Structures are given as structure tokens and as C-alpha cells.
């Protein structure tokens, strides 16, 4: 769970060849450490304006001509979240489908998202939870 192997992330983004992301990809290639990955992830999610629009345009164009489950997921998410830079997340994070009765454990500080279905999350108290 969490992030895909860095080599896989580099492969996805290198194949997309998005000019607006090339600097981030080059930096990740040069620094394939958790810090390098965090810098890549935050840099990508911080894109704004024309850079963001151009990067998403290339991603969605590729998704429309690539018949792979991962790109089909990106197109499905785009219907719900048009223009969201998070559409790149499936290329960086492992996509896991749980069946009824399945469970998984996530270490602290592991990025994750629930895309559809119903789930129960059990966690300890933390300082980033609002209680009423």
C-alpha cells in the first residue's frame, strides 16, 4: 500500500513525457529516496494555472487512447473531479481493491484514499482529527 516503487512511478511519468513535469521527473530520477519522492509528490500536487492544465490535458489524452485499468480509473475519476491534479495519484499510489471481508493495515503517514464503496477505518486519536 502507499506509494508504488519509485522505478514504476518514474516509468509512468517518463512514458507520459509531459514537458511541464520533466523537471520534477528528472529530480526524482536523480534522487530516488523517500525525500526525493516526497518532493516529487508535493511538487506535482502544487502545480497551478497553465502548467496544471497542460499536464492534465496530456494525462487525459493518454488515458483516452490507453486501454489499461489504471488509465480507465483516471478517466472515471476525471468525471467526478474534473481539473483536479489528484488525477495523477493512481500513477503514484498503489491501487488496491478490497473484497467484502478483506482488511488492510496502513502505517502512520501513509498516503491513501478511498475511491468507492463502504469501509470502516479504525485509528488511534491524533492531532489532526476534529472532534465534536
Q: What residue ranges belong to the model's regions?
A:
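Long, charge-rich alpha-helical interaction segments
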Residues: 13-80
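Generic, ordered loop/turn and secondary-structure boundary motif
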Residues: 4, 92-94, 115, 130-131
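Active-site microenvironments in enzyme catalytic cores
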Residues: 1-13
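Conserved AWS/pre-SET-to-SET junction and N-terminal core of the SET lysine methyltransferase domain
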Residues: 72-100
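Conserved metal-binding segment of the jelly-roll/cupin
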Residues: 1, 97-115
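Short helix-capping and hinge/turn segments at secondary-structure transitions, especially at repeat
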Residues: 79, 106-109, 127-128
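C-terminal, non-catalytic macromolecule-binding modules
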Residues: 118-132
Amino acid at each position: 500500500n502507499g506509494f508504488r516503487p519509485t522505478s514504476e512511478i518514474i516509468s509512468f511519468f517518463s512514458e507520459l513525457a509531459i514537458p511541464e513535469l520533466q523537471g520534477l521527473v528528472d529530480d526524482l530520477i536523480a534522487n530516488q529516496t523517500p525525500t526525493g519522492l516526497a518532493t516529487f509528490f508535493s511538487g506535482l500536487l502544487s502545480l497551478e494555472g497553465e502548467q496544471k492544465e497542460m499536464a492534465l490535458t496530456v494525462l487525459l489524452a493518454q488515458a483516452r487512447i490507453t486501454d489499461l485499468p489504471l488509465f480507465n480509473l483516471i478517466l472515471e475519476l476525471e468525471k467526478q473531479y474534473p481539473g483536479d491534479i489528484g488525477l495523477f495519484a493512481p500513477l503514484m499510489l498503489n491501487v488496491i481493491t478490497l473484497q467484502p471481508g478483506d482488511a488492510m493495515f496502513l502505517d502512520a503517514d501513509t498516503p491513501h484514499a478511498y475511491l468507492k464503496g463502504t469501509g470502516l477505518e479504525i485509528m488511534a486519536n491524533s492531532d489532526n482529527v476534529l472532534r465534536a
